[in-house]
Amino acid sequence: MSSVLDFAPQGSAPPPVRDAATVLALRDTPGGPEVFMVRRDSRMGFLGGAHVFPGGAVDAKDCDGALHEGVSGFEAVGDLARIHADPARAKGLLMAAVRELFEESGILLARDAGGAWVDLDQEGPLSARLNAGRAELSARGGDFAALMAADGLRVDVAGLRFFAHWITPEREKKRFDTRFFLARAPERQSARHCEVESSAGEWITPGRAFGRYRAREIELVPPTIACLERLATFASVEDALAGTALAAVPCILPKILIGDEVVILYPGDPDYESGEPRPPAGRPTNRLLMRDGLWHRP
């Protein structure tokens, strides 16, 4: 079984679920879109050692209406109810996405007083202050809103596109209700992983990620696999953003079954409701199987 999964004993009460946001930061290459991924430190209690997209739990401050007054682009995101029924919570998820992306990758979706994306590659007082603030945020001691206000920066969520919605299965010890977003990475911002929670970071195409996974060089978990599979269908960042702007985003709550083999059933699988997987026998399925330590489609 994958070493990054952490299941509770059979029959245990499901743990509480926390809202979370994750961002697939994208850039164009001749070989198609690349996404920035980080390798979570193996000592982390959740998905330790796995290659994931930058993200994390929503904080109370993310949902503060006063904070939202200083943010641009909520109207450009579209119907906030697609993200969450509570508008304040939907905005909080978008704010968490921006904050966590900055903490874990150094990519900042914010504009200066002139309306340009912040230039973090230019050495100077601004980049120095932001990098220091990022380090404080990563250590859970900083204030993201105050960091932005100090230099007159304005968070801009207009480029975020709601991409996927996953809830951690009930069998896992830690559970999150996670919204995944796409965003084009601004130029003049070199992504770098956070050394507090991750041990490496890289730009990678979906094809290369799957190749490294099959070679057992990296660990991937099912939501990441599904997002990479979908991202691989787009030829460019613009295609990905346009193709997801208004697309329906179903909520996916997988069911994990542990027996002679580990099976994950997704909504739409013929055995999802019963929770008792049978051999496909020619039927179309929507599931993953764990074989020899790797996830496979049947």
Predicted segments, located by residue:
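N-terminal leader/linker segments that precede catalytic domains of diphosphate-processing enzymes
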Residues: M1-P298
